[in-house]
């Protein structure tokens, strides 16, 4: 039975918020289901002046993605981070899939019209 991804969530210079931690962990697990090549999620939430920043690094088989978001509210920064990660992971995933299709299409001779 395959294990789930390794998820590390850090709250830097702020108190840990269990509700946000649980929503981030759930979001990471859903992303790992959709993108099975991912093996590790590292997320860091920190205050930044008047708002909050969220950083993430996702690694896995042929996958390395980094993301950064900002928002006034900590929860909003966390939600934006998950949305950004999904978009970036989809981009990397599609590149891996369509790269092979493009290569196969280039190697296949085109049919001539008669």
Language-model-derived ranges and their functions:
Residues 1-114:
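N-terminal, polar/charged subdomain of small-to-medium soluble alpha/beta proteins
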């Amino acid at each position: 039975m395959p294990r789930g991804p390794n998820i590390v969530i850090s709250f830097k210079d702020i108190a840990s918020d269990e509700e946000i931690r649980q929503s981030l962990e759930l979001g990471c697990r859903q992303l790992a289901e959709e993108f099975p090549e991912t093996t590790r999620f590292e997320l860091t939430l920190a205050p930044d002046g008047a708002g909050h920043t969220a950083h993430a690094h996702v690694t896995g088989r042929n996958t390395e993605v980094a993301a950064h978001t900002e928002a006034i509210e900590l929860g909003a920064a966390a939600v934006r981070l998950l949305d950004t990660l999904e978009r970036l992971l989809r981009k990397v995933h599609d590149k891996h899939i369509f790269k092979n299709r493009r290569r196969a299409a280039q190697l296949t001779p085109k049919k001539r019209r008669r």
